[in-house]
Structure formats: C-alpha cells, structure tokens
Amino acid sequence: MNVKMEKIEENVVKLEITVEADKFNESMKKAFAKNAKKFNIPGFRKGKAPMNIIKKYYGEGVFYEDAMSFCCESTYPDALKENNVNPVDYPKIEVVQIGEGKEFIYTAEVTVFPEVKLGEYKGVEVKKNTYDVKEEDIEQELKNMQQKDARIETKENGSIENGNIAIIDFKGFVDGKEFEGGEGQDYQLEIGSGTFIDNFEEQLIGLNAGDSKEVNVKFPEEYGIDDLNGKEAVFKVTVKEIKVKEIPELDDEFAKEVSEFDTLDEVKEDIRNKKQEANKLREEREFEEAVLEAVCSNTEINIPEVMVEKEVDNMIRDLETRLKYQGLDLETYYKYTNNDEQKVREYMRETSEKKVKADLVITEIAKVEKVEASDEEIKEKATEIAKQYGSDDVEKMAKIILDGQKEYLKMQIVNEKVMKMLVDSSKIIA
C-alpha cells in the first residue's frame, strides 16, 4: 500500500491511497462471498453460479461497491496510522481507479484534530467570587419549610382572599376561539403566587365557591407563543372550592416536627451550615471555570466546524433525554419556547465552542505534562460511582462500569488531575 498526503486547508487533509491489485482481488472475493446467494443465473442453482458468470450477466462492476467498502475498511485505518493522522469525523471517499487485476486507488478527505498552541497555563491570575450566608437566606428557607409543613383545609365560609387556594375550572378564549393549553379542571391556584398571567388572580378575590366569572387579561408581548403574544384573552372561570393554608408557628415545636433538632436555633444553625457548604462548592466550581477560561484565552486553536456541530448534536440529544423524563419531546419544546431546531442550535453554538476548546486544551496539557490514569485509579473511580448508585453489590456494579466505561473513566481522571494542577498553580487576585 502506498499513501500520499496533501494538506487541503487548515485541519483538512487528503490521503491518496493506492492498494495492490492482489489485495483488491481479495476484497472482490469477499464481496462475491457476501452476495453470491442473491443471484439466480440460468443453468445454476440459486447462489451456486461462479463469479465470472455473474459478472458476465451483471457487468464487471457488480461487486465493486462491496469490494471497495471491504478494501477501504482494511486499508484506511493503516493509512491514518502510517501518516499520524488523527481524524475528527468520517472521511469523504472518492474512487480514482477501480478494476479487477488493477491497483485500487482512492482518496480520503478528512477533517483532523487542530493544532493546539498553548500559552501560559500555570500561574494564571483569576478573581475568586465569595458568597456569604445572609439572614434573609435563612429566613426564606424557614418560610419554605413552613409552606411545606402547612395544613390545607377547606374554607367553609367566606370568599377568596389573598393567600387562599382556589380550586377552579377554566377555559380561555382569544379572538373568541379556544386555544391550546387554555383549559384546566380542578386546578389549584394559590392567589398571590403570580402563577397565572398578570391580573388573573386578583380578579378572583371576593368570589365564593360555586361562583363563575369572565376574567379579562392580556398576554405579555413576549409570552413565548406566537398566537398568544400580546393578545387580549377572556377566561371563563368557575370556583369549585376554596382552601386555606394553616402556616405553623416558627418555634421549638416546629423544629422538632420538621427536623431532628429540638430547638429552632439549632435548625437555623443547620441551615446556615448547609448554605455555607453549598456556597463553598459554588465558589470552587466558579473558580475552576474561571481558571480554565483564562487558560483557554491564552491558547490559540482554529476549531474545525465539524467539531462544534458534533458537540451541538450531543447537546440536542441531552436536551431530548431531559425532556423525555418530563413527558415532553423536542417539537413540543420548540413550540412552547417559540423556537425551532435552527434557533436552538445557534443558541447552543457559543457553549459548544467553549466546551470543545476546553476539552482540546485539557487534552493537550495532559499530553505535555504526561498526566495519566493508572489502572488502580480507574478501578477506584468505578467503585466510587458504583457506591453512588447505591448498589447492593458494589464490586459487581464497579466491574460492569469498568467493563463498559474504562476509557471514559480514564479521561475523567486525567481531566480532574489537569484541573487540579491548573487550580493549584493559579493566583487569586482582588
């Protein structure tokens, strides 16, 4: 096999690969073996006609497509290895010469991983955000706990007041016509929560159970659905029931009921500690991101478009998976966010470019610094993940993870080591 390499443009090369006639003939035999049973030739049992007879009936090129495929599959990887080509995507194959008894010549045009020109990556100067726990944060958490522990009871007498929960049936109309998503039954609406369109909840105040009313509202200009943006709407509402929340008092009895503590002061201290820990994790995460961003800004890379698009594809698939867990699909998401695939892909591009660049930078630093993951470290990582799954048989689960995700775990460990090195060497500035 002979290979000539030509640089077409930055990050794109073309390989001209010449395969010996004997090797191509072997591929022809494989193609014949794969397809022989499909042919029904007069004078022969089906699938028993020899190659030369089949070619006589169907033409010399009858097996070329499969033979070409077999030949490329067996020679293209060797051509890449021989020329130290690291492809990003599948190649564009074009046949130059093909024929039995002749050399098989084809070209493979392929996008390759870009050159990464690292700048300063040790000792980068970065600001570190800090977050304090405020008293209002603790008070808000206590209010949330009160709401969760509140008792909901039917309001036997009286009309709807702010803070009450109205059980309603409603049907919405725009321009006199019903619209999708504008109808509900037995909907629990907390008055004052701001759940519905502006001025909807306020118009229910004073109604009694059994009352009906037409509520007039206007959708916001940027509501997110073209047919409703800025439109006047009328909702026919029937109040079926009114409920009240009985909010518990904030005292030691409340503390005992909602926690493992005996006093309200202990609950407050626990909230403070948990929020401080959460803030610390946030500070560390944001600092890591800032360090990596600084290192990336010092690095020159001309990222191939195909890498950005592939990452966007991954992001779309992740979005689709998350939506499925919520019982939604992409089309529904696009509709209710007033988007389409093109808009979403464009929105994701910036994040995609940053991620691709960050991955390339970390990989290059790992190569320069000779950062590796040992087999023992990979096993420990698999065990750590197995424990997080809460498996009854951690050892068995770790083996399953190791067998299926060894390369991913290896990459994860290397990335963590590189990030630790970058963070440890960085300098915090005011």
From Swiss-Prot:
Subcellular location, record wording: Cytoplasm
Domain remark in the UniProt entry: Consists of 3 domains; the N-terminus binds the ribosome, the middle domain has PPIase activity, while the C-terminus has intrinsic chaperone activity on its own.
Keyword Membrane: no
Alphabetical list of InterPro entries matching this protein: PPIase_dom_sf, PPIase_FKBP_dom, Trig_fac, Trigger_fac_C, Trigger_fac_C_sf, Trigger_fac_ribosome-bd_bac, Trigger_fac_ribosome-bd_sf, Trigger_fact/SurA_dom_sf
Identification of the protein by name: Trigger factor
HAMAP family in the cross-refs: Trigger_factor_Tig
EC number: 5.2.1.8
Similarity comment text for this entry: Belongs to the FKBP-type PPIase family. Tig subfamily.
GO biological-process terms attached to the record: 'de novo' cotranslational protein folding; cell division; chaperone-mediated protein folding; protein transport; protein unfolding
Keywords: Cell cycle, Cell division, Chaperone, Cytoplasm, Isomerase, Rotamase
Catalytic activity reported: [protein]-peptidylproline (omega=180) = [protein]-peptidylproline (omega=0)
Tagged with keyword tRNA-binding: no
PROSITE patterns, alphabetized: FKBP_PPIASE
Species assigned in the record: Clostridium kluyveri (strain ATCC 8527 / DSM 555 / NBRC 12016 / NCIMB 10680 / K1)
Top-level taxon of origin: Bacteria
